[in-house]
Amino acid sequence: MSKKWFTYENGTVKEYGSVDKFPENCVGFVYKITNIQTGKFYIGKKSLYSNIRKKLTKKELAEYSGPGRKPTKKLVTSESNWMDYWGSNKGILQEIKDSSTDSFRKEILKFCFNKKQLTYWEVHYQCINEVLLTDKSYNDNVLAKFFRKDLVESE
């Protein structure tokens, strides 16, 4: 179900199939997934790495020497599932399941170098594309704070 990510700049297309091709110190990106047939789109963010707290093994606990209480867990950083990621919106995921990934284009809008940038640029692109005001967007909310249903004007 994997399909590569692309950037479109100044008429050139660049393909991203591995973390090595991303800019140095990049922690994630803001993306746009577009249904080519309908023009409907989804804007979101994705981190390139995830942190997992793993329990220390007996050997690691035995090797620990230091003041205070022994730690029980360690922080392990690993590459996220960014390559196979298709967003968190149930609507777009169902459409991908029903049709195929060939009907969709995965585009990187902005590379980000810390988590605050990642959140800011996601909200920026969602707002300038008016994701809650157009029927051409799969997005139902912005920041889990502003919802499409709350913006519908009642008569």
Language-model-detected regions and their locations in the chain:
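Structure-specific nucleic-acid interaction/processing domains
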Residues: 2-155
